[in-house]
Amino acid sequence: MMGGYDIMKRLVRRALQGGPDASFLFGSFIRKARYTFMIGIYDYTVVLTYCSLISASLGIIVCLHGIGHPFYGVFFLLLSGLCDTFDGRVARSKKNRTAMEKSYGIQIDSLADLVAFGILPGCIGIAMLRVSKRFSDVPHIRHVNPDDKLVLYPIALMIIVILYILAAMIRLAYFNVMEEERSHTENTARRYYTGLPVTSAALIFPTVMLIQFLTETDLTMLYFGVMVVVSFLFVSKIRVRKPGLKLILAMIAIGAVEFALLVFIHWRAGGI
């Protein structure tokens, strides 16, 4: 296989000899360098999945920065949900995908979903705990007296976060295995999911945050209670009908309304 230096030298020589234009040379170099230097897939079929992961990563950073900013974390959660809504359709639009590309798409989508809809909601909960007035008197674990029973509250809530992330991971791994087995026996599209899809977190938790802002009530405990319920639904054997186009559009509309209301409320509060 031709090395990276040889590729560059060949392209430069062709340019000096009056070969193709610079844009073609650059594109050719990128395509060849991609297979020479890097692993992975970088075409349009996975762009939205990568964007979802980037959005989730930013959400985690802002949630854990300083005292915590759960409000901004919810914005990134909604954005990740929007990317996830369309990434599958974009990937399937490429008709000549290889088996490796399809398998890669499934795996990378699940990994991104674990970060976006597993870890990020947990970080939002941690940020809510930090800014909650109800828990302002609860000491930090590293500063607490072992005999102080108040420390049990944050420990219990951290356990809920860990179990939630674990449930999301189990759900995604199970889905990948079942989807691979189904692809060998069925050619039709899936009609039902077993267990609640993890992407539902993109609408469930922003709703809790929206209610908190509308009612001006500290709903930190409710948020963690919802995490417990959702964790169970992730790994339950309930059958959830796969949403059709109308339901997908309805969920997009709900997410857009939640996003707009959160922006408006935060703007009225002088946060933007």
What is each residue range found by the language model?
Residues 3-27, 177-272:
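C-terminal membrane-associated helical module and adjoining short loops/tails
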Residues 11, 28-53, 92-115, 156, ...:
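Interhelical loop and helix-boundary elements at the membrane-water interface
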Residues 47-50, 93-172, 209:
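Multi-pass membrane catalytic core of lipid/isoprenoid biosynthesis enzymes
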Residues 51-56, 113-122, 196-209, 227:
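Core segments of transmembrane alpha-helices
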Residues 51-107, 157-165, 226:
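Membrane-embedded alpha-helical segments that form the functional core of polytopic membrane enzymes
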Residues 55-58, 87, 119, 167-170, ...:
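Membrane-embedded alpha-helical transmembrane segments of multi-pass integral membrane proteins
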Residues 56-63, 124-127, 171-174, 205-209, ...:
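Structural signal for membrane-spanning alpha-helices in multi-pass inner-membrane proteins
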Residues 62-65, 126-136, 174-181, 215, ...:
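Juxtamembrane transmembrane-helix termini
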